[in-house]
């Protein structure tokens, strides 16, 4: 019998193997990573943390725990950018973990200051 193969699909999400093989990350956090990855590539939409919380059936505590885990293990960065006297928040989902600080503040030129 010939080796089997998967039929190709349209509209699918590709996830880096790094997080799927990371034994330190819970299945809950991996699931949240997958959900975020599936949506952030959609054109003409800016996604917020609250949007993703509303897409899941987990309660606030479970969602926040998975969110924190992604930050703590370097898969999610939070950038604070100055915007007319306030801070604008931008999230960055990483393909590979970066164990440096997960929260970064930028000056008006976009340079990291903290």
Located regions from the model:
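N-terminal leader segment of winged-helix/HTH proteins
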Residues: 1-9, 77
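N-terminal amphipathic alpha-helix
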Residues: 8-16
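Extended aliphatic helical segments
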Residues: 14-15, 35, 78, 112
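Winged helix-turn-helix DNA-binding recognition segment
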Residues: 19-29, 36-91
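Charged low-complexity intrinsically disordered patches
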Residues: 93-114
């Amino acid at each position: 019998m010939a080796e089997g193969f998967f039929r190709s699909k349209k509209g699918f999400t590709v996830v880096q193997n790094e997080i799927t093989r990371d034994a330190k990350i819970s299945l809950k956090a991996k699931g949240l990573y997958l959900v975020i990855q599936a949506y952030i590539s959609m054109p003409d939409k800016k996604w917020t943390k609250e949007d993703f919380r509303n897409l899941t059936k987990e309660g606030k505590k479970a969602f926040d725990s998975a969110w924190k885990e992604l930050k703590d293990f370097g898969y999610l960065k939070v950038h604070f950018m100055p915007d007319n006297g306030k801070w604008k928040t931008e999230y960055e989902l990483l393909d590979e973990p970066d164990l440096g600080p997960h929260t970064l503040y930028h000056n008006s030129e976009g340079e990291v200051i903290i």
